[in-house]
UniProtKB/Swiss-Prot annotation:
Organism: Corynebacterium jeikeium (strain K411)
Keyword Cytoplasm tagged: yes
Function according to Swiss-Prot or TrEMBL: Peptide chain release factor 1 directs the termination of translation in response to the peptide chain termination codons UAG and UAA.
Protein name (Swiss-Prot/TrEMBL): Peptide chain release factor 1
Stretches for region Disordered: 51-79
Length: 358
């Protein structure tokens, strides 16, 4: 399975051009431009590295084959290299395949408690901590933009920004894009005196936040801006002055909040960035109706009957209903150990995409 030389040559030329740009001190005077170039460089780097390994393996295999008739060890080496070449060709094919254009992007995640009252809010808080732990262990930075808590420390709603610390081919969107939907929990609530198992739900919405939000114009007449005092408790890393901002986009009824910054002006600017990202995603989904299915069909209702995943405490089981995934490691999952689950979701998505191409 060989790749078109012209495709590789074009990528190599672009890669070398980006490398030259990154070595230019002038570029780094513009952080946004430097980040854009760095991100594209990181997207191409695995392709170049895999191609170079493949070319070297082919050369080594050819040399070993020529010596195989004289030395048995070279025959074994030639066979091993054939297998390595096959693996590298498959890797290169995957790297060159069309990919989600947002995979390198940062994200904004909204977590809202649903059916289940205080217990649902406590569960929403556990989901938030789960995502924060996973993100921070995997080199992402997290920032709470908005937080509305209950008296018991549960989360009514939270807006969380998850960003790559360095430009990367695989950004936060590639990791978290399958988490949007309704998450259901089955357990005995701390608020339940009779010891009965109850079902509660929390909703998660994930959307990419590209470096550049294209073609999104927001008229001042289309938004309502409210200023309020945040409800974050001490230690939550959010501002508690009267500078928190809530922006409602009237045509779509989308609401975004930001209370992280110390000034109303800064919070408004950050909230407008988030709103632009939301509207960009909405525009893409309307232009491409199948996008919602392609992104694992995020469920925007809080109805606990429509769920993507169930967290069953009595049996310590996590079940993802979209792909039939089950694992009895609930405690570690809620502690942020999501590697196996996310890998299974990515592989199922890859299989669907390959099937669609056939």
């Amino acid at each position: 399975m060989s790749q078109s030389p012209s495709v590789i040559d074009d990528i190599l030329a672009e890669y070398q051009g980006l490398e030259m740009q990154l070595s230019d001190p002038e570029l780094h005077n513009d952080p946004a431009a430097a980040r854009k170039v760095g991100k594209r460089f990181s997207e191409l780097q695995p392709i170049i590295q895999t191609h170079q390994k493949l070319e070297q393996a082919r050369e080594d295999q050819e040399a070993a084959s020529e010596m195989a008739s004289e030395d048995k060890e070279f025959a074994e080496e030639a066979k091993r290299l054939e297998e390595e070449i096959s693996e590298l060709e498959e890797q290169l094919t995957d790297l060159l395949a069309p990919r989600d254009p947002h995979d390198g992007d940062d994200i904004v995640m909204e977590i809202k408690s649903g059916a289940g009252g205080e217990e649902a809010a406590l569960f929403a808080g556990e989901l938030a901590r789960m995502y924060q732990r996973y993100a921070e262990r995997h080199g992402f930075s997290t920032e709470i933009l908005g937080l509305n808590e209950t008296d018991l420390g549960g989360v009514k709603d939270m807006t969380l920004s998850i960003r790559s610390k360095q430009p990367s081919r695989d950004g936060a969107w590639s990791e978290f894009k399958f988490e949007g939907g309704v998450h259901r929990v089955q357990r005995i609530p701390v608020t339940e005196s009779q010891g009965r198992i109850q079902t509660s739900a929390a909703g998660v919405l994930v959307y990419p936040e590209p470096d550049e939000v294209e073609d999104v114009h927001i008229d001042d007449k289309d938004i309502r801006v409210d200023v309020y005092r945040s409800s974050g408790k001490g230690g939550q890393g959010v501002n508690t002055t009267d500078s928190a901002v809530r922006i409602t986009h009237l045509p779509t009824n989308i609401v975004v909040t930001c209370q992280k910054e110390r000034s109303q002006i800064q919070n408004r600017a950050r909230a407008m960035q988030v709103l632009a990202a939301r509207l960009q995603q909405l525009k893409e989904e309307e232009a491409e109706a199948e996008a919602a299915e392609g992104r694992a069909a995020q469920i925007r209702t809080m109805d606990r009957s429509e769920r993507i995943r169930t967290y069953n405490f009595p049996e310590s089981r996590v079940s993802d209903h979209r792909i039939g995934y089950k694992a009895n490691n609930l405690d570690s999952v809620l502690d942020g150990d999501l590697e196996a689950l996310l890998a299974a979701l990515k592989e199922a998505d890859r299989a669907r995409r390959l099937e669609a191409e056939d």
